[in-house]
């Protein structure tokens, strides 16, 4: 349940909780998640795969300058990709859903709710991709336990917030909970790296 695994687990949990909501809630989450996962699948996974070998090499060579540079440039790239994607999905959620899905049994009301869910999911998109980078920073140091423990905290956060928010926000509350839990995950990953002096922002990133 590390990296993309915890994201998928949170979606599964959200879907289970949504089963107690009115008919259609699960579909709204499903279609919104499909679109939200697209930038993550294209850029996040590729970034993590490319980052790990080069970062591992720099760490084994005790090259702190190169290590910091790789980590900072990776975060820069993740933000450069994810922020425009998140803004685009947030602003254009409704027309995107309308064009792609509104036909047959998927009516205007479904478009409205799915778009709302997507816009809230999008708030967590930068965090999802940053998580890919930060988890790779742990893996490159052969530390798999810390990201695992942090992912457990993220899942618990998601469950608690989802249960608190579904009463007033329906499936949108589940999307908000998922986004917040992703940022909690990313923040904790960064804090543990910083505390251990494994992460230091340079002037370019700041």
Feature names for model-found ranges:
Residues 1-206:
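Membrane-embedded alpha-helical bundles of multi-pass transporters/translocases
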